[in-house]
């Protein structure tokens, strides 16, 4: 067993926007260690966002992440041989991680031609409180609400 928990690694801000949140989404988009490609995709998507919304892409992106962040999630807890889905509050760093993961995941599932367009459209949709990532957050909250009776089993 481990002696203690591995320390959280600090994320360096990205070179263009000087923002750690942008670096984190780049790391989520990245596949097979191709960070340069992930950066090209995201910065291209940001250019597209700027063209379509006439707003700063960073503000649109931050609004999108804020809209997708879940407040509650379900954790499975085994008590007396049965599994209960217990709603628990989500810590701030996990909220951000889930939001970024959901945005990237649902962007990949979209039907636009390029990944650049998929990411741009998913971010725009999320900033307008629509899209699949927002639906995922709402479904998570609905499930938590439905299992509210087990909230006293938190640990």
UniProtKB/Swiss-Prot annotation:
- State any GO CC term: small ribosomal subunit
Q: Which GO terms describe its molecular function?
A: rRNA binding; structural constituent of ribosome; tRNA binding
Q: What keywords were assigned to this record?
A: Ribonucleoprotein, Ribosomal protein, RNA-binding, rRNA-binding, tRNA-binding
Give the UniProt family note: Belongs to the universal ribosomal protein uS7 family.
Q: Which PANTHER family match?
A: RIBOSOMAL PROTEIN S7
| Family annotation (InterPro entries) | Ribosomal_uS7 (IPR000235), Ribosomal_uS7_bac/org-type (IPR005717), Ribosomal_uS7_CS (IPR020606), Ribosomal_uS7_dom (IPR023798), Ribosomal_uS7_dom_sf (IPR036823)
Give the source species: Mycoplasma pneumoniae (strain ATCC 29342 / M129 / Subtype 1) (Mycoplasmoides pneumoniae)
Q: What is this protein called?
A: Small ribosomal subunit protein uS7
What superkingdom does the record give?
A: Bacteria
Q: Which NCBIfam families match?
A: rpsG_bact
Q: Which PROSITE patterns match?
A: RIBOSOMAL_S7
